[in-house]
């Protein structure tokens, strides 16, 4: 019986599972949003919340504890400087899981794991009104041929 057994093994050995968690945590704190399977998101979420709690403490010991889970020093520095300061007044619930449906290849449930209250960066839309001045079709082929011939000469 499986009474009081916490966490999922995710079909991996212990070392492989912890390597997966480290990679997911590094990606999460680098990009502040990752897309992964629902099971992986649920497994990583408590670790991510714990790291934000460590970042709020901002002590040397807390940094060293964070480095055991996120081996990239630049990511830990960013975690303690920006993310920890952002959630200074929040008492928990630093991440959210948004379910996206299923993956096309194997029908695995996919989810987005993201930090709450993250600053929204607007995507730049390409200008549809501007047209390129380069010739298209046969004219482009002739122009390339002429440029190549001029370059050799």
PLM region spans:
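Structured, basic alpha/beta domains of bacterial-type, RNA-associated proteins
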Residues: 1-153
């Amino acid at each position: 019986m499986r009474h009081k057994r916490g966490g999922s093994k995710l079909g991996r050995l212990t070392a492989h599972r912890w390597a997966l968690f480290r990679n997911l945590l590094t990606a999460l704190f680098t990009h502040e949003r990752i897309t992964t399977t629902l099971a992986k998101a649920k497994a990583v979420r408590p670790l991510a919340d714990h790291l934000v709690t460590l970042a709020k403490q901002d002590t040397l010991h807390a940094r060293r504890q964070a480095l055991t889970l996120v081996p990239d020093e630049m990511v830990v520095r960013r975690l303690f400087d920006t993310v920890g300061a952002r959630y200074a007044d929040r008492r928990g619930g630093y991440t959210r899981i948004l379910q996206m449906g299923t993956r096309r290849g194997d029908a695995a449930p996919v989810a987005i794991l993201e930090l709450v209250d993250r600053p929204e960066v607007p995507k730049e839309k390409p200008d549809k009104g501007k047209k390129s001045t380069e010739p298209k079709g046969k004219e482009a082929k002739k122009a390339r041929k002429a440029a190549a011939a001029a370059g050799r000469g």
